[in-house]
Amino acid sequence: GIPTLCKNISKNYSFQYDLNSILSRLIYGRILFPSSKLSCYEQSTKLYEQPNFELQHIYRSLDVLAKESDNIQATLYKNSKRIIKRKTGVLYYDCTNYFFDIDSEDGSKQYGVSKEHRPNPIVQMGLFMDMSGIPLAFCINPGNQNEQLSLKPLEQQIMKDFELSKFVVCTDAGLSSESNRKFNNFGERSFITAQSIKKLNNNLKE
């Protein structure tokens, strides 16, 4: 489970804080009272099991969690199969973005096409879900990146880390580039995508 996962991750670093305690509170907080990390820390002191870390440790742990993201996702997927049957025959993929109240670009926070039509720098998030609507894997990319380019790398990660090879990928028209369609028209993979009737050839319209 998560305690064992955090213990194994901690062996590769020299930090002194309890990663499992922090990650547990972040998960509780996201479910019970989704808010900032500061608010999550303040709210966690109201829980029966008191946190054994300081606010600064939450912020420091975020870099570790980001570096270990792929490992965490793969481990959680494998562990989840012991509890429920994961329906991975059909995978749904979509992208969204998040804005930041900052005045200039910084790292992955870049000016791009905001889903909320805001002028702020954004980061892009891509997410795969299984047939039950349970998250499978996600990726974070710069806000100025074409979201079509995010599908293939994350899908390759799923095939490698999750050992999946046979599935149908469902996307909207915005993610259905020719390159993505060709990639998912190979081996035991296939795809379903939305298609504008107006853009179809006349013979297909008929």
Model-based region annotation:
Residues 27, 77-82, 111-115, 123-126, ...:
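Generic recognition of flexible, low-complexity loop/linker segments
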Residues 147-206:
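An internal, acidic/charged active-site-proximal segment
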Residues 107-110, 184-186:
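Short, solvent-exposed amphipathic alpha-helical segments in soluble enzyme
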Residues 110, 124, 131, 141, ...:
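Short glycine/serine/threonine-biased micro-segments
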Residues 118-131, 144-159:
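Structured alpha-helical segments in the cores of large, soluble enzyme domains
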Residues 13-15, 74-75, 109-112, 151-152, ...:
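Short secondary-structure boundary micro-motifs
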Residues 1-107, 119, 128-139, 144:
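Dynamic "connector" segments at or just before major functional cores
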